[in-house]
């Protein structure tokens, strides 16, 4: 099966690429990392005008979705240009509110997410212990459970809503990517819903978050590869470009193959939206981007990891996205629940828990 974009999807990708190229994102990323949100919010509004956030919002709430394939197209471009902010989290929040089946909360919050008026951050079971950019978000959603799960029962989940300035306030956790600000979630504020439907909605939101992260990772990897190819054409050694050396060509070819193998997995997952398919796509894209980052750093040499050099903005993001919304080991475990051996012992022995 071939997963090729149609003309409309290609035009959408081209328009986003042109928008983000004109925006010159490296200064925006650096400003966001220092806490200056003004350039980032301005770019966020332009992305919303292009329809990016409306892709996860149903038409009934002023969106155009749900359109997971188009969302994947958009997030590849967002990753390619390193756009900062709670992009994935806003999508996950939109899906969470849409899947709840509670029209009151959806009508109140979803139009603002679709239009870009509001940024959201969200904490979900299975999504990791931290929330992203809580201090910049206007909407904070936290799903938790009042009881610990047992072997035979899953307690009902609760969804809490808090607004700007009243969300997670715990001490920040340093991230390898300076543009990602992490804090611990605190389930406080208005109780929007409780019950099994919250658990279901949270699972759907997690799947969308992993899909968007996979697409973002693929875009980051493609950007790293493109920048490295250009660099090895210019950097000379022994009087010739280092890109002419066979060893360099092989490393770049390996990176290209890994990224292109991840692409059909991503779009296949966007068509099925099966949790195991999405988890497989996230592993493939995340590992391909991380491997490309290592190759890019090696071929650039010392200049590659200097903070002043733009390549570092993508190097750190590739590493951070690799474990965001599910580590490689967690995503592989998700795949094994459907496609792996029946035995838990066999499943555990089949993967590296350190990955």
What are these model-predicted stretches?
Residues 55-57, 88-91, 121-123, 147, ...:
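Short beta-strands and strand-loop turn motifs
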Residues 78, 82, 97, 122-123, ...:
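Alpha-helix C-terminal capping segments
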Residues 1-79, 207-355:
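Alpha-helical interface subdomain recognition
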Residues 85-102:
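N-terminal glycine-rich flavin-associated loop
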Residues 73, 77, 92-96, 108:
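Generic beta-strand or strand-like secondary-structure segments
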Residues 95, 103-226, 346-355:
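FAD-binding core of flavoproteins
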């Amino acid at each position: 099966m071939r997963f090729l974009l149609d003309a409309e999807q290609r035009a959408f990708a081209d328009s986003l690429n042109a928008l983000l190229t004109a925006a010159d994102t490296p200064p925006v990323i650096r400003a966001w990392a220092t806490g200056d949100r003004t350039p980032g919010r301005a770019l966020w509004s332009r992305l919303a005008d292009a329809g990016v956030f409306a892709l996860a919002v149903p038409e009934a709430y002023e969106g155009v979705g749900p359109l997971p394939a188009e969302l994947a197209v958009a997030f590849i471009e967002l990753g390619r240009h390193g756009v900062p902010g709670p992009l994935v989290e806003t999508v996950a929040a939109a899906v969470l509110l849409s899947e709840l089946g509670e029209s009151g909360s959806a009508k109140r919050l979803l139009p603002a997410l679709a239009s870009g008026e509001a940024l959201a951050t969200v904490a979900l079971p299975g999504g990791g212990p931290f929330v992203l950019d809580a201090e910049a978000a206007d909407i904070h959603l936290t799903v938790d459970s009042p009881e610990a799960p047992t072997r035979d029962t899953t307690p009902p989940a609760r969804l809490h809503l808090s607004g700007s300035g009243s969300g997670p306030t715990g001490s920040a956790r340093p991230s390898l990517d300076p543009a990602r600000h992490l804090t611990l979630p605190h389930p406080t504020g208005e109780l929007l819903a409780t019950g099994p439907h919250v658990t279901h909605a949270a699972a759907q939101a997690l799947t969308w978050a992993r899909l968007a992260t996979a697409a973002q990772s693929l875009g980051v990897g493609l950007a790293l590869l493109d920048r490295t190819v250009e660099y090895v054409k210019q950097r000379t050694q022994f009087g010739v470009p280092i890109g002419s050396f066979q060893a360099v060509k092989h490393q770049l070819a390996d990176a290209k193959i890994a990224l292109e193998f991840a692409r059909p997995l991503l779009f296949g997952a966007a068509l099925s939206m099966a949790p195991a398919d999405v988890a497989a796509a996230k592993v493939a894209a995340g590992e391909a981007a991380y491997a490309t980052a290592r190759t890019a750093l090696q071929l650039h040499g010392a200049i590659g990891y200097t903070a002043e050099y733009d390549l570092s903005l993508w190097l750190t993001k590739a590493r951070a996205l690799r474990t965001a919304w599910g580590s490689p080991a967690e995503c592989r475990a998700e795949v094994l629940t459907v496609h792996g051996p029946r035995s838990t012992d066999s499943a555990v022995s089949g993967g590296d828990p350190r990955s």
